[in-house]
Each structure stands twice: as C-alpha cells, then as structure tokens.
From Swiss-Prot:
InterPro entries linked to this entry: Capsid_hemagglutn, Hemagglutn_HA1_a/b_dom_sf, Hemagglutn_influenz_A, Hemagglutn_influenz_A/B
Record keywords: Clathrin- and caveolin-independent endocytosis of virus by host, Clathrin-mediated endocytosis of virus by host, Disulfide bond, Fusion of virus membrane with host endosomal membrane, Fusion of virus membrane with host membrane, Glycoprotein, Hemagglutinin, Host cell membrane, Host membrane, Host-virus interaction, Lipoprotein, Membrane, Palmitate, Signal, Transmembrane, Transmembrane helix, Viral attachment to host cell, Viral envelope protein, Viral penetration into host cytoplasm, Virion, Virus endocytosis by host, Virus entry into host cell
Residues of the signal peptide: 1-16
Protein name: Hemagglutinin
Sequence similarity: Belongs to the influenza viruses hemagglutinin family.
Organism per entry: Influenza A virus (strain A/Equine/Tennessee/5/1986 H3N8)
Membrane protein topology class: Single-pass type I membrane protein
Coiled coil: none
Gene giving rise to this polypeptide: HA
UniProt GO molecular function: host cell surface receptor binding
Disulfide bonds: C29-C481, C67-C292, C79-C91, C112-C154, C296-C320, C488-C492
Subcellular location: Virion membrane; Host apical cell membrane
Gene Ontology terms describing biological process: clathrin-dependent endocytosis of virus by host cell; fusion of virus membrane with host endosome membrane; fusion of virus membrane with host plasma membrane; viral budding from plasma membrane; virion attachment to host cell
Length: 565
C-alpha cells in the first residue's frame, strides 16, 4: 500500500511540473503569419497548395465600353472601312479622316451600286494599317468615252450618283475606243489605286453601255499584271440592280508606273491613296465609345492591362495581355498558409512554425513569440520579412513584361474560295493559343513554386540565425521553439530579435540551470514508464488483496468452494 501511495505521489509530481514556468528559464518560438482562409494556387509539385495571399493573373471581363484614350478611335457608325474608302455617299463624312483604330459596327451597310471585292480582307487590312483615307486626285485622260457614270442605286441627296473615288466609264455616242493610260509614281511613297470592272446583268445592257459584246480590263505595273473579263449575267437584285461591280486594287511603288488598258467595262480610278506604315487597325465591335483611358481594346470593350493574361477576346488592339484559354491563374504573393491551431503545445503553450502558423501578426511575415518571467509576448522580424517581400515584389511586373503584346492582333477574314487557307489559319491560331495557355500555366506554377520555396527558406534562415546566437544557452525543443536556460526578460528577448544577444554573458547561468533542471526533470518517456509501472503494481496489489480476502473467507467458513470432477 505504501508503494502505491508513493507511485501516485510521484506521478502527480511529474505532471505538476512545467519546465517553462520557472523564473530562471524562458521559451522562445519562431513562426510565420497565417490567415484563417488562404488561397489555393498551383505549383510544379502540387495541383493545389494554400498560400496566405495570391493575385489573379487573368483578366476575364471588359469595362463594357471602348476608351477613346490612349488611341484615336474612329467610330464608323453606319459605314464599313471599305465603303468609306470607296466614297459611298452616306460615308462622305469620313473622307480624309485619320485613326489608330477604326470601329466597324454590325449596323453598317452599303448604300451604293452593289459590289464585291475578291480580296476584301487584304484590302481592308492595308487601308486599316495605313490609318488614313487621305486621297489625291490625278489627271487621268480618258479620251472617247463618257465619264462620271451614275446609278439610281447610289443616291447622293436626291440625285443619282456613284462612288466618289471611282470613275465609271461608258460609251460616247456609238463608240468605246480602246483606252491606254499610264501614270508614273514619281513620289517617294507607295500609292494605292482602286479600280473595278462592271458585270452587266445581260448582253443587251453590255452593248448598250459599252458597244462591244465583251469588254476587258488589264492593269499592269513593272511587278504585276491583272486582266479581268466581265461575267455577264443576271444576279439577285440589290437596290434595284442585278449587275455587279468587282473592285480590285494595285500598289505602285516609287519609280514604278501604272498602266491601264481597256476596251470596255472599266471603272477607273480618280487618283490614289497614300499608303503609310503604322500600327493602325480596324475592329468590329458594338461596344459604345466613351471618354476613358485604356491601352488595350477588344471587341467586348477596353480592358485593363495590369494583368499578363486575358480571356476576354482573341482580337485585341494596343498593349494587351496575352489571350489564353484559362479563366483563372493565381500567382502566389504570400507564403505557404498553415492555419493556427486553437490548442498548441504540450502544455497549451506557444508553438513554433513547424506545428502551425500564427494568425494576427500585423508587424511582419516572420516573428517571435516568447514566455518569460514577465509574461508572454509577440514581435515581428522586419529584416526577414523585407527580404521575402523584396524577392516577391516585381514578380507580377516581370510576368507582364514577358507576355504583354506591344502590337495588335487583327481579325482574319477569307473568302469562300480560300476555305482551306482559312482552316489552316484557324489551326495555326488555335495552336498558338494552346501553346500560350500551356506556357502561362507552366510559368505561373514555376513562379509559385519559387515563391513558396523562398518564403520557407527565409523562415529557416531566421531559425538558424537564432540557434547560432543562443548556442549552448538554449535547447531546441522541436517544432520551432527554444528553451532558454537562463533568466531572459523582455530586453534579453529583444537582443535576440535584433541580433545583439551575447551568449557569453548568460553562459554560466545557463549551464548551472541546465544541470539543476536536468537533475530533476523527467522526460515524457519516463513519465510513460512510471505510469505503466504504477498501473501494473496497483493491479497486482488489488489481485493480492482480493485473493487474500477469498482465502480468509474460506477459512472462516463464510465462503465455500466446491470443485467437481
């Protein structure tokens, strides 16, 4: 019985001891900040890892309107760029206009003689990139024919008219002589000439306008030649006409010469457009134009370019984020997040970074928590925090610099006869987008991995720095904490934080306290052994007492035991 009492008292004494509560010791833990709800990001090694903070890299919505600053945006309203160039009567307001971006609306329409352009997309692109409709009339001499043909399908006011940049030539009297006209380019810039050929709806209309049963138009330069023969025949009626005009174009280089030969059906140029090299463009959009500032425009509206990627539209103009297929990509701008546990430590005490993070840190990403004779406290470590922030800052800007396009992505158009080219172009564009989408995901995963690794490294650096300062004056308790074997008040803790701690001052006291404490301190393993031994002895004593009672009762006759075989 005495043995049992002694063991119980010893067990109670063991658990009543708290190694960190003495006035001659202190506990110092290192940790990093945490948040209750972090953000999931992707790294090279993990599909989902929680961090304290992250920045979205994909712009997924526009502002819903096109900003007229930082670019000169020209609203085409009811006119397409080509109609404005040809001089459709209802587009006269656009003559001599300039633009960085010409906006074509879905409500745009032609209101003159019906026409087609076999290479519409190329002509549209050339005129759009020039950024101007500057036109210069030239003195072409057309002898023996009637100029300035008009049509009831093309009203200028209430009068019949025609495209202002083209000259429709028809017979004069009963003749249409062969025309041979030359026009040299003596300037130092490229000239764009627009011309066409008329396709009558019937043979009767052909001879009525041009005498000959079939005309021909040949336009040549030193570098090229085009010969077009009219296709006579009825077509669907458009604005009262079943005939058509096909529009063609020729670029004449400096020192070259334009030659026009025709015996009928010619729609002649009146002059040239001056071609300019630039980054102007054209875009189809119904978004309203408003006064605001944006460096990136899409058909959906302008978008900010403070992110490296966008998922709004493949067609862009200006300094724009790269288009990718992902709706979201998050860049880690904080460390690995380990939410703080409510109960920490073996005795409910403070715990270090290996166990969990610390919520509520406002003065740094890394810091110290301590228990000493003056109580408990917490303080951030600015140096390690700044080192981590300096490495993370600029990541977003570097990603933007790598990905933002400093040019526009124009729309691609092809005629039906170029269907195979269109399919090939679509395949190439889709492949480019897939490649960029993969590269974007890989780039962000690499950056996230680097961010998490470097923030973990800063935590380890701070721990090693503290351990080297304390040396033999403290013991690594595991979990990111140290037990300091000397009295360490708040001033002492402050010297450890700022790197001025002198372990020689406390060395003798620490060694003395360490030996005293080690003499009586029982490790958790010994506590377990004492518990098991105490339990075993108690069970044995209970069995002995019970057996003795049974034997005593049998001897007194109070209990009878019958054994039957």
């Amino acid at each position: 019985m005495k043995t049992t009492i002694i063991l119980i008292l010893l067990t109670h004494w063991v658990y009543s001891q708290n190694p960190t509560s003495g006035n001659n010791t202190a506990t110092l833990c290192l940790g990093h900040h945490a948040v209750a709800n972090g953000t999931l990001v992707k790294t090279i090694t993990d599909d989902q890892i929680e961090v304290t903070n992250a920045t979205e890299l994909v712009q997924s919505i526009s502002i819903g309107k096109i900003c007229n600053n930082s670019y000169r945006v020209l609203d085409g309203r009811n006119c397409t760029l080509i109609d404005a160039m040809l001089g459709d009567p209802h587009c006269d307001v656009f003559q001599y206009e300039n633009w960085d971006l010409f906006i074509e609306r879905s409500s745009a329409f032609s209101n003159c003689y019906p026409y087609d352009i076999p290479d519409y997309a190329s002509l549209r692109s050339i005129v759009a990139s020039s950024g101007t409709l500057e036109f210069t009339a030239e003195g072409f001499t057309w002898t023996g024919v009637t100029q300035n043909g008009r049509s009831g399908a093309c009203k200028r006011g209430s009068a019949d008219s025609f495209f202002s940049r083209l000259n429709w030539l028809t017979k004069s009297g009963n003749s249409y002589p062969t025309l041979n006209v030359t026009m040299p380019n003596n300037n130092n810039f490229d000239k764009l000439y627009i011309w066409g050929i008329h396709h009558p709806s019937s043979n009767n209309e052909q001879t009525k306008l041009y005498i000959q049963e079939s005309g021909r138009v040949t336009v040549s330069t030193k570098r090229s030649q085009q010969t077009i023969i009219p296709n006579i025949g009825s077509r669907p009626w458009v604005r009262g006409q079943s005939g058509r005009i096909s529009i063609y174009w020729t670029i004449v280089k400096p020192g070259d010469i334009l030659m026009i030969n025709s015996n009928g059906n010619l729609v002649a140029p009146r002059g040239y457009f001056k071609l300019r090299t630039g980054k102007s463009s054209v875009m189809r959009s119904d978004a309203p134009i408003d006064t605001c500032v944006s460096e990136c425009i899409t058909p959906n509206g302008s978008i900010p370019n403070d992110k490296p990627f966008q998922n709004v539209n493949k067609v862009t103009y200006g300094k724009c984020p790269k288009y990718i297929r992902q709706n979201t990509l998050k860049l880690a701008t904080g460390m690995r997040n380990v939410p703080e546990k409510q109960i920490r430590g073996i005795f409910g005490a403070i715990a270090g970074f290996i166990e969990n993070g610390w919520e509520g840190m406002v003065d740094g990403w890394y810091g110290f928590r301590y228990q000493n004779s003056e109580g408990t406290g917490q303080a951030g470590d600015l140096k390690s925090t700044q080192a981590a922030i300096d490495q993370i800052n600029g990541k977003l800007n570097r990603v933007i610099e790598r990905t933002n396009e400093k040019f526009h992505q124009i729309e691609k158009e092809f005629s039906e006869v170029e269907g195979r080219i269109q399919d090939l172009e679509k395949y190439v564009e889709d492949t480019k987008i897939d490649l960029w989408s993969y590269n974007a995901e890989l780039l962000v995963a690499l950056e996230n991995q680097h961010t998490i690794d470097l923030t973990d490294a800063e935590m380890n650096k701070l721990f090693e720095k503290t351990r080297r300062q304390l040396r033999e004056n403290a013991e690594d308790m595991g979990g990111g904490c140290f037990k300091i074997y000397h009295k360490c008040d708040n001033a002492c803790i402050g010297s450890i934080r700022n790197g001025t701690y002198d372990h020689y001052i406390y060395r003798d006291e620490a060694l003395n306290n360490r030996f005293q404490i080690k003499g009586v301190e029982l490790k958790s393993g010994y506590k377990d052994w004492i518990l098991w031994i105490s339990f075993a002895i108690s069970c044995f004593l209970i069995c002995v007492v019970l057996l003795g009672f049974i034997m005593w009762a049998c001897q007194k006759g109070n209990i009878r035991c019958n054994i039957c075989i």
